[in-house]
């Protein structure tokens, strides 16, 4: 019997089973122990293959692919610390709902805890963070192929959101010519190999029913809070709220068009908070809210009912309101709960939103970080998409900009880390093949710098704007000790990104005014290549501008 040949047949069943559940993208890191999985993926024509030498970046690449494709994405890595490097992307997927299937090669059981090289305890390594975990046995013909395929099918059928970790031990030899070893074992699956359906099909109904008292609540004074959702859902939510006459507080990720812009500014005004206290019901569609003032209001508001609608399971309400947690796709829920045409009940908030917007517009000519956030709408590629980084930049865009309704916006706002942002953006672009504008801070870019390798080949124009304010200026907004702030919080690195762009053969610009930025963008959108645009800005102006605007709007 050829161990290497049967390893490959075992792996081929696993990979073929994935195709029956919508997996088309497979992300592969180099490794020896993962050879059976890698070769099975390489030989399966149903897959689009992506490779990267860094497993942490590979996991985030898969995360971006899953975000844009809305399909599960597979990841193949070898044993050892390669597995642990998938942890950040797995955690993010668990919080934002993207489906990742992590195929981790492993040493066989007899090589664990005995000093064997590159052998760690991989079973259960991710603790409670995966939605599903599957520890397969060592490949053996004593286990029928139908057990293997039905086990994979069952795990994928139960995967509603987040990651499925499949640990796959393989014994040596890992290399060798294919022969007939295991062919009969494999052929016992019959015409399944020519079919397109799973071996085991399970129907799972889990969406919330129609709320029968909706006709009663839609006649009340309500507020709509829009969190993370798809572009199509964002447009529908905006129309739904407008028909109801309810104010819509739209997060930067809501894609609703934010009809009441600058919410994170005007929510700091006591008049707005007082008017919102009249709301009898708050309907929150989507999770992952960004704005600090929005989160503060959400934590203190006390409507009669607080409903949270999201396709992800779990509470999703850190304020623990009395109300309803409804698990459903937002578009489906809106269809079951139509709006009734009513006049707007809020008067003060639209006025405050307009005045706040005017204050922001008055400062747009200065070349700086806050002004870029406000202007970002003008720089979006036509028929394209936006990827927003974390820390200060996403807060500035949320507070100071008004993105178009239905324009695709992506980010990693689950755990909200700055790791893997460039890799995630690369995955979003690969899955959608759209022109992409990504904007991150300098520390975020440094953290994921080797992901620039993923941006060397793109199918459409990709612009990466690195806002270089020399450190983690988000901490300037927090009451960090002044004497310790620079060394222990901001950590300025005093670097520029021209050499990084050159190392990966990317186009590079460092504009010093708006005209130069617009010329660089105009050139970038004409070519299917990556352009890195570094905006060197005053270190503290972005945070200070936000604080000044908050103070101004609070006294309107």
From Swiss-Prot:
One of its GO terms (molecular function) is magnesium ion binding. Its EC number is 2.2.1.9. SUPFAM superfamilies: Thiamin diphosphate-binding fold (THDP-binding). Keywords: Magnesium, Manganese, Menaquinone biosynthesis, Metal-binding, Thiamine pyrophosphate, Transferase. One of its GO terms (biological process) is menaquinone biosynthetic process. NCBIfam families: menD (TIGR00173). Homodimer. This is 2-succinyl-5-enolpyruvyl-6-hydroxy-3-cyclohexene-1-carboxylate synthase. It comes from Salmonella arizonae (strain ATCC BAA-731 / CDC346-86 / RSK2980). The lineage of its organism: Bacteria, Pseudomonadati, Pseudomonadota, Gammaproteobacteria, Enterobacterales. The gene is menD.
